[in-house]
Amino acid sequence: MSFLIDSSIMITSQILFFGFGWLFFMRQLFKDYEVRQYVVQVIFSVTFAFSCTMFELIIFEILGVLNSSSRYFHWKMNLCVILLILVFMVPFYIGYFIVSNIRLLHKQRLLFSCLLWLTFMYFFWKLGDPFPILSPKHGILSIEQLISRVGVIGVTLMALLSGFGAVNCPYTYMSYFLRNVTDTDILALERRLLQTMDMIISKKKRMAMTRRTMFQKGEVHNKPSGFWGMIKSVTTSAPGSENLTLIQQEVDALEELSRQLFLETADLYATKERIEYSKTFKGKYFNFLGYFFSIYCVWKIFMATINIVFDRVGKTDPVTRGIEITVNYLGIQFDVKFWSQHISFILVGIIIVTSIRGLLITLTKFFYAISSSKSSNVIVLLLAQIMGMYFVSSVLLIRMSMPLEYRTIITEVLGELQFNFYHRWFDVIFLVSALSSILFLYLAHKQAPEKHMAP
């Protein structure tokens, strides 16, 4: 009876997650597109529902909600379904919609979709060869084979996003990095833009006048005919045509310059708005957050470097370890186990909420940046694939933030994976991503004032 009640709770929550994914799809991703493939919408919503269910089961594990056997059953079922979606269903439909957009392959799209899926499976399987991700006793058809490979892709993605986010967040929030933009700077750039537009207009007028003169002289229509006439037309040109070509090249260069000046002007306006915003209470709050995240970024880079150099992976979750150090230093009586459970629950909850929110915001921006009416179905399925792999990998990494007694069921469900490898791999990719982001933002920040203030 308790199993039925537990299952009804899980099914209800999955229906709610599915509905939220459906609404997000309709009101965010596809609100500007008329053509909707319901199979794409269903796949995206189902992936979102089962991804969120994994996080729900982590919270239930900490709070002790549901029977332990029920939790284990739903862990196993949820994991099998999400892997089925990520490895078999989504890649096949991505190939199907890619082939459907090619007219030459339209009649045999099912065959070519299968070929694309087999190609994906080959590279997906070969991905596991260079990495020590499995225990030697796992068979080739075990579920761990799929989890391990999905984990490598997802952890790599998480580390790349985390590395860039850890650097970009303080850079975006802190007023220290804002350039000092005045109205004089904006007016000077707008004056250059107007001068460029005037030059483009005057040169186009000259081109129109030249064409009119050539037309009146009969240089446009009196073309020689026959073979020798064609040879002559190639080897010789009308007196005004060379001038037209030269002016057209100048116009093209000026139009490119005008586009750059327009973008720089818009950037200066945005920077000026950010300067005004930084003076408000909310702006000062985000500025404080920027300093906090900059300290976190430095600490995270330092710890990732230490972990890589000394091949170190923590065995105790950060909350418990931090409380133990504080209690030992202050010499006070404190129930470490009791409070570490509650603080770990809050920490894991914050990680889950921020991960889901941050990923959805990133997915929305990414979708609007690259999608079109023809490619939108493929892009949504790619986002569903990324989302599922991201959440599966989050479970692998969140495991280390949980007290030891709560890690057991996750270890049992995921199998005997080499969890330490995933943490080391995350540190390596995070460090590369963070340092690359620092270099990129430094060069962009250094070059921006020179570009904007050039005479």
Swiss-Prot record:
Annotated InterPro entries: ABA_GPCR_dom, Golgi_pH-regulator_cons_dom, GPHR/GTG
Organism: Bos taurus
Catalyzed reactions per annotation: iodide(out) = iodide(in); chloride(in) = chloride(out); bromide(in) = bromide(out); fluoride(in) = fluoride(out)
Topology term for the membrane: Multi-pass membrane protein
Keywords: Glycoprotein, Golgi apparatus, Ion channel, Ion transport, Membrane, Protein transport, Transmembrane, Transmembrane helix, Transport, Voltage-gated channel
Chain positions carrying an annotated carbohydrate: 180, 243
Subcellular location: Golgi apparatus membrane
Family of this protein: Belongs to the Golgi pH regulator (TC 1.A.38) family.
GO biological process, one term: intracellular pH reduction
Organism taxonomic ancestry: Eukaryota, Metazoa, Chordata, Craniata, Vertebrata
Subunit structure: Homotrimer. Interacts with RABL3; the interaction stabilizes GPR89A.
Primary location class: Golgi
Molecular function as annotated in GO: voltage-gated monoatomic anion channel activity
TM stretches of this protein: 5-25, 46-66, 79-99, 114-134, 150-170, 290-310, 343-363, 378-398, 425-445
Cellular component per GO, a single term: monoatomic ion channel complex
Function: Voltage-gated channel that enables the transfer of monoatomic anions such as iodide, chloride, bromide and fluoride which may function in counter-ion conductance and participates in Golgi acidification. Plays a role in lymphocyte development, probably by acting as a RABL3 effector in hematopoietic cells.
Name of the protein described by the UniProt record: Golgi pH regulator
